[in-house]
């Protein structure tokens, strides 16, 4: 019974690895080959029990064990996946004589060849080992996290959290709560035992409580042999591709357990901290900065009581939130804005024109679309449209759960929502008025 059950779980794990690599795309030929392989395994599991001792089932099970915890959104995926593929290929070679004529074996060999071609894996190079003690890398979070799970018999991959800040400013917390806040001045987004992130927000327009981010400071704390403390700082019109000490990486020069990658000069950089499994995106859109972070839950929640003021963890203080709790306001989408100084300040933007401009970039009318409309009406700055769009792109790149990418303000089916933090469909007008009080 054990041999017959294994391929089924293997198929699910292999499919999950492919889905993480290309979310939302049609299954590639490779996945179909793997599914065919595992289906054949279900039908012919008995083939591996013949006196010749074909061990293709063991090779396949080991490969699934080595790859089921990997995630393509995290730095180092390709390297680890190729190592596992080479180990899989080596295993099939060692059992080739015993598996001659076995359809499952030959399907596996074909699948491995296609996988290595699609992933651009070289045939020569390091391989993964099914013994986690051998492959343990203290400066690769995914390596030692996977080893711990393997020892415990836990096949669930590490849990990751996402936090983002953009626009006027809009905060998405680790709990997927969505808030619009004032938070003028310097505020900590994250302050745990591994990472500190602080943002500084300044007023956007005179007479308004709306602010936006013009400075970001990130401290990667020293981590024994993996990296010395590294500080990154970005301000408006100065988005460097290096830490403040002039370096672009931390730790061993070959391993690069911490590194900066410049994607668009002066506008977009990424920081990959392999030793803590963390990825940070920093962008400048218009005059202001945006931030997106993906971090393992066990590390993100590792902090002392004195570090409880973290916007990514607990959200903005109530006194700093711009919410719709100031009165009973009916849904205003499709209605006209009241005649206020806001309309006089930016006559080019009405609710209708703001909706139209935001819809061009974001066809799904989720909370990011609503934030875009809100920012246009409160600031008159068209760059906030691009900021909301890039923030959504960062969610799609870093958020671990695809079903939570879009947050809908009026959702009643369990979809994450801003709740009392921001219910845009019930309060855009009220929010705009509050900003200018």
Swiss-Prot record:
Disulfide bonds: 139-226, 163-312
Gene: RGMB
Cleavage, annotated site positions: 168-169
Residue positions assigned to the propeptide: 414-437
Glycosylated residues, chain numbering: 120, 383
Pfam families associated with the record: RGM_C (PF06534), RGM_N (PF06535)
Modification after translation: GPI-anchored.
Family of the protein in this entry: Belongs to the repulsive guidance molecule (RGM) family.
Gene Ontology MF term list: coreceptor activity; identical protein binding
Signal peptide (UniProt feature, chain positions): 1-45
Comp. bias (Polar residues): 121-133
Name of the protein: Repulsive guidance molecule B
Region (Disordered): 121-153
Organism: Homo sapiens (Human)
Subcellular location: Cell membrane; Membrane raft
Keywords: Autocatalytic cleavage, Cell membrane, Disulfide bond, Glycoprotein, GPI-anchor, Lipoprotein, Membrane, Signal
């Amino acid at each position: 019974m054990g041999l017959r059950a294994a391929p089924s779980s293997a198929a699910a794990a292999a499919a999950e690895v492919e889905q993480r690599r290309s979310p939302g795309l049609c299954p590639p030929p490779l996945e179909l080959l793997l599914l065919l392989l595992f289906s054949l395994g279900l039908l012919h599991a008995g083939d591996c029990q013949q006196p010749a001792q074909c061990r293709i089932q063991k090779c396949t099970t080991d490969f699934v064990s080595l790859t089921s915890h990997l995630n393509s959104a995290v730095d180092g995926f390709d390297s680890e996946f190729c190592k596992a593929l080479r180990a899989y290929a080596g295993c099939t070679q060692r059992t080739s004589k015993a598996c001659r004529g076995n359809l499952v074996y030959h399907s596996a060999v074909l699948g491995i060849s296609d996988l290595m071609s699609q992933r651009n894996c070289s045939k020569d190079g390091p391989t993964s080992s099914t013994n986690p003690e051998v492959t343990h890398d203290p400066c690769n979070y995914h390596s030692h996290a996977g080893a711990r799970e393997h020892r415990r018999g836990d096949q669930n991959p590490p849990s990751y959290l996402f936090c983002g800040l953009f626009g006027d400013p809009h905060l998405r917390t680790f709990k997927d709560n969505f808030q619009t806040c004032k938070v003028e001045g310097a505020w900590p987004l994250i302050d745990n035992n591994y990472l500190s992130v602080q943002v500084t927000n300044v007023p956007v327009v005179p007479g308004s409580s709306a602010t936006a981010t013009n400075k970001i400071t990130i401290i990667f704390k020293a981590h024994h042999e993996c990296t010395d403390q590294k500080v990154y700082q970005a301000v408006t019109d100065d988005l460097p591709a290096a830490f403040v000490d002039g370096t672009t990486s931390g730790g061993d020069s070959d391993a690069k357990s911490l590194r900066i990658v410049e994607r668009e000069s002066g506008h977009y950089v990424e920081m990959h901290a392999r030793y803590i499994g963390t990825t940070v995106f920093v962008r400048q859109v218009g005059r202001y900065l945006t931030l997106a972070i993906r971090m393992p839950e066990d590390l993100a929640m590792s902090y002392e009581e004195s570090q409880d003021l973290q916007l990514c963890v607990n959200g903005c203080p109530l006194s700093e939130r711009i919410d719709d709790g100031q009165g009973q306001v009916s849904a205003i989408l499709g209605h006209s804005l009241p005649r206020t100084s806001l309309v006089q300040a930016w006559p080019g933007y009405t609710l209708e024109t703001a909706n139209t401009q935001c819809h061009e970039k974001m066809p799904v009318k989720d909370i990011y679309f609503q934030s875009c409309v809100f920012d246009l009406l409160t600031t008159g700055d068209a760059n906030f449209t691009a900021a909301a769009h890039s923030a959504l792109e960062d969610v799609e790149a870093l958020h671990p759960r695809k079903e939570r990418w879009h947050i809908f303000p009026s959702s009643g089916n369990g979809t994450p929502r801003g709740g009392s933090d921001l219910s845009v469909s019930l309060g855009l007008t009220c929010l705009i008025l509050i900003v200018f009080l």
